[in-house]
Amino acid sequence: MKAIFAGSFDPPTFGHLDLVLRARSLFAEVHVLVAVNVQKRYLLSECERVDLMRQVLGDRPGVYVFPWRSLVVTYARDVGARVLVRGVRNATDFCQEFDLAWVHRALDAGLETVFLAAKPCYAALRSSMVREVASFGGDVSTFVPRVVARLLQEKFTQA
């Protein structure tokens, strides 16, 4: 069975990677969609985010990374995926993700959403927090893979 894990990944964190790997243990294929949310301003370009996800996930069997600029339900229909995987860190996340699951279900009644609870060590980890720490020159290596930390350092050194 194919599952989709979509996010902006700006930047990808160890929490994101953990969710992808856990989803892969449950599903034959996990399609990671690096999405564009028109309501967000990004630090990293779409190409950088896709490239970073591909680098940190490597050539793991059954894990595929693609950029996506449309509705997730459209991609699901295109590839025959019936499951969306969403990570939740806390009750606030759950409420937001539950609302999103309702929208997905309204658009495609056959699409299920599976919620994976974040591991406790990732429960407070947010990409926005990583960006803020990096913007002040802080060490983000405990939150993101080395390649991501290097790119963030470059971005904020140039700014």
Curated annotation (Swiss-Prot):
InterPro entries in UniProt: Cyt_trans-like, PPAT, Rossmann-like_a/b/a_fold
Broad EC category: transferase
The keyword Nucleotide-binding appears for this protein: yes
Cofactor: Mg(2+)
Gene3D superfamilies assigned to the protein according to its UniProt record, in alphabetical order: HUPs
Cellular-component GO terms for this entry: cytoplasm
The protein's annotated pathway: Cofactor biosynthesis; coenzyme A biosynthesis; CoA from (R)-pantothenate: step 4/5
Site (Transition state stabilizer): 16
Disulfide bonds: none
Binding site for ATP: 8-9, 16, 87-89, 97, 122-128
Catalytic reaction equation(s): (R)-4'-phosphopantetheine + ATP + H(+) = 3'-dephospho-CoA + diphosphate
Residues that coordinate or bind substrate: 8, 40, 72, 86
Cellular location(s): Cytoplasm
Single Gene Ontology BP annotation: coenzyme A biosynthetic process
Record family assignment: Belongs to the bacterial CoaD family.
Function: Reversibly transfers an adenylyl group from ATP to 4'-phosphopantetheine, yielding dephospho-CoA (dPCoA) and pyrophosphate.
Protein name: Phosphopantetheine adenylyltransferase
